[in-house]
Amino acid sequence: MPALRSRTTTHGRNMAGARALWRATGMTDDDFGKPIVAIANSFTQFVPGHVHLRDLGKIVADAVAGSGGVAKEFNTIAVDDGIAMGHGGMLYSLPSREIIADSVEYMVNAHCADALVCISNCDKITPGMLIAALRLNIPTVFVSGGAMESGHAVVTGGIVRSRLDLIDAMTAAVNPDVSDADLDTIERSACPTCGSCSGMFTANSMNCLTEALGLALPGNGSTLATAAARRGLFVEAGRLVVDLARRYYEKDDEAVLPRSIASAAAFRNAFAVDVAMGGSTNTVLHLLAAAVEAGVEVTLDDIDQVSRSVACLCKVAPSSTDYYMEDVHRAGGIPAILGELDRGGLVDPNVHSVHAASLREFLDRWDVRGADPSPDAIELFHAAPGGVRTVEPFGSTNRWDTLDTDAKNGCIRSVEHAYSADGGLAVLRGNLAPDGAVVKTAGVDESQWTFRGPALVVESQEAAVDAILNKVVKAGDVIIVRYEGPRGGPGMQEMLYPTAFLKGRGLGPKCALITDGRFSGGSSGLSIGHVSPEAAHGGPIALVRDGDLVEIDIPRRRIDLLVPDAELAARRAEIEANGGYHPANRERVVSAALRAYAAMATSASTGAARDVRLITG
């Protein structure tokens, strides 16, 4: 039977100094011997998805104390990708994932905590904490801040824009048909509440996937930040984590540990949910990196296999203008998607979670489309938006009149009535991306699933934006944005502004954008990222020249540069003779912190995680 990790600092004569310090935090004799639960919060006033988290740690802490544990809260950083977008700040976004993972590990191990509650929400925070939880492998529960409500506005002529999000503000900004007054109205209306942006962008995708992996409670991914019902998730997380700690430390039950829950089968199920719901392409990076910490061998080939066999059941903004996270919730959230996949034989039932001994037990209680869902499930998924601008959580007691259980035409469809037989994400390969590239097919009109056009090559996101706004980009072009990979950027910038500006100028369905960088979960259109190897590693994307024909064939999972091999070899020799693989005309200040990340960053095809062997040999 494992001893409490915290006994290292709370027991024995030699630990008098440590106990003295614990006492100074408010602990008493009765607390020594109870499980110490670390609460990793990520409150910050920089990020709407985190601005409301300040007091939520106390809700968890009170529940921990009431269940017989000792709660100790700390904070970690959180970068807002939307605010950091389009300038040098985006270089720091992906590297922050590693900083978050390290900071959680440092705090938990330095203080010998016994269990962990992760209060996350936005893009790199949930994956960073997930990496840490799997690395630490102590009883852990995830509970995120919840999704933002979609916006509403009335513009010139009394036209009602009934559903808005951040991307609408970006695209309107470059649309010459949108007046300054209407742009101002859209800007003020697009992000009306606290919470992670309202579509199936990276933050909400990852919060849904922690639920699918089994490390979060039902409803974690879809319950709005403003919903009163969300408060109960924080209370239950505090109660549950103490129960998990007791099962492990008092009963030697290793089934409660993150690596037991996030098994190979659980990761396959998570990828199935990901492609079924058309999640952000960033999820591929994050799940690959998390799988490394879980000791689970997952490759892009595995993801490709899932994407070919699992149908696209759900299209949410930015892939749709009809559905947002509040609609996913009304349709039953992740339990409903898992339920449809289970009925289609597309998930492995032999998995368990922090809250259920099996997938069947989970779905029997929480799938509102099942035979006999629990009253708790019916109550939770009726939670509706409040429609009031606020930065405070839990204020809405509004309820949907009915749930959306329409499996034919509703937000979440059955396998029989899927949007497409293939999933919402696909892995492409070819001579332009020998190690793979990723595209969110749920956001690509089927008319663009095959595309051929001349390359227009730029070597930074900023240059891509300039080319789009200055009308250098024409319909039919394939924009190549290179040297923006994990090492080449460094930091693998997101290309949200280029895709949003293409859309705003009416070129979204007429162009393709290919990069060794990545895309925001808010991107849509024929946007192919994670091209591997990246240009800085000598990948073929470094060899592309203006005017080269590029061919994309999503049904065949191909992406090819239509240039003879001999010509490509000659270009490679020329580059290597002139100093190797680096951008020719880019001025960018790269800090020591970013250089340190770049020195250890691996390929996007392996999650862009760090590998210390790159510097230690």
Swiss-Prot record:
<feature type="binding site">
    <location>
        <position position="197"/>
    </location>
    <ligand>
        <name>[2Fe-2S] cluster</name>
    </ligand>
</feature>
<comment type="pathway">
    <text>Amino-acid biosynthesis; L-isoleucine biosynthesis; L-isoleucine from 2-oxobutanoate: step 3/4.</text>
</comment>
<keyword id="KW-0408">Iron</keyword>
<dbReference type="GO" id="GO:0009097">
    <property type="term" value="P:isoleucine biosynthetic process"/>
</dbReference>
<keyword id="KW-0479">Metal-binding</keyword>
<dbReference type="InterPro" id="IPR042096">
    <property type="entry name" value="Dihydro-acid_dehy_C"/>
</dbReference>
<dbReference type="InterPro" id="IPR037237">
    <property type="entry name" value="IlvD/EDD_N"/>
</dbReference>
<dbReference type="GO" id="GO:0009099">
    <property type="term" value="P:L-valine biosynthetic process"/>
</dbReference>
<keyword id="KW-0460">Magnesium</keyword>
<comment type="subunit">
    <text>Homodimer.</text>
</comment>
<dbReference type="InterPro" id="IPR004404">
    <property type="entry name" value="DihydroxyA_deHydtase"/>
</dbReference>
<dbReference type="InterPro" id="IPR056740">
    <property type="entry name" value="ILV_EDD_C"/>
</dbReference>
<protein>
    <recommendedName>
        <fullName>Dihydroxy-acid dehydratase</fullName>
        <ecNumber>4.2.1.9</ecNumber>
    </recommendedName>
</protein>
<dbReference type="Pfam" id="PF00920">
    <property type="entry name" value="ILVD_EDD_N"/>
</dbReference>
<feature type="binding site">
    <location>
        <position position="81"/>
    </location>
    <ligand>
        <name>Mg(2+)</name>
    </ligand>
</feature>
<comment type="similarity">
    <text>Belongs to the IlvD/Edd family.</text>
</comment>
<feature type="binding site">
    <location>
        <position position="494"/>
    </location>
    <ligand>
        <name>Mg(2+)</name>
    </ligand>
</feature>
<keyword id="KW-0411">Iron-sulfur</keyword>
<dbReference type="Pfam" id="PF24877">
    <property type="entry name" value="ILV_EDD_C"/>
</dbReference>
<keyword id="KW-0456">Lyase</keyword>
<dbReference type="GO" id="GO:0004160">
    <property type="term" value="F:dihydroxy-acid dehydratase activity"/>
</dbReference>
<feature type="active site" description="Proton acceptor">
    <location>
        <position position="520"/>
    </location>
</feature>
<feature type="binding site">
    <location>
        <position position="123"/>
    </location>
    <ligand>
        <name>Mg(2+)</name>
    </ligand>
</feature>
<feature type="modified residue" description="N6-carboxylysine">
    <location>
        <position position="124"/>
    </location>
</feature>
<dbReference type="InterPro" id="IPR020558">
    <property type="entry name" value="DiOHA_6PGluconate_deHydtase_CS"/>
</dbReference>
<feature type="binding site">
    <location>
        <position position="122"/>
    </location>
    <ligand>
        <name>[2Fe-2S] cluster</name>
    </ligand>
</feature>
<keyword id="KW-0100">Branched-chain amino acid biosynthesis</keyword>
<dbReference type="GO" id="GO:0005829">
    <property type="term" value="C:cytosol"/>
</dbReference>
<keyword id="KW-0028">Amino-acid biosynthesis</keyword>
<dbReference type="GO" id="GO:0051537">
    <property type="term" value="F:2 iron, 2 sulfur cluster binding"/>
</dbReference>
<keyword id="KW-0001">2Fe-2S</keyword>
<dbReference type="InterPro" id="IPR000581">
    <property type="entry name" value="ILV_EDD_N"/>
</dbReference>
<feature type="binding site" description="via carbamate group">
    <location>
        <position position="124"/>
    </location>
    <ligand>
        <name>Mg(2+)</name>
    </ligand>
</feature>
<comment type="pathway">
    <text>Amino-acid biosynthesis; L-valine biosynthesis; L-valine from pyruvate: step 3/4.</text>
</comment>
<comment type="function">
    <text>Functions in the biosynthesis of branched-chain amino acids. Catalyzes the dehydration of (2R,3R)-2,3-dihydroxy-3-methylpentanoate (2,3-dihydroxy-3-methylvalerate) into 2-oxo-3-methylpentanoate (2-oxo-3-methylvalerate) and of (2R)-2,3-dihydroxy-3-methylbutanoate (2,3-dihydroxyisovalerate) into 2-oxo-3-methylbutanoate (2-oxoisovalerate), the penultimate precursor to L-isoleucine and L-valine, respectively.</text>
</comment>
<dbReference type="GO" id="GO:0000287">
    <property type="term" value="F:magnesium ion binding"/>
</dbReference>
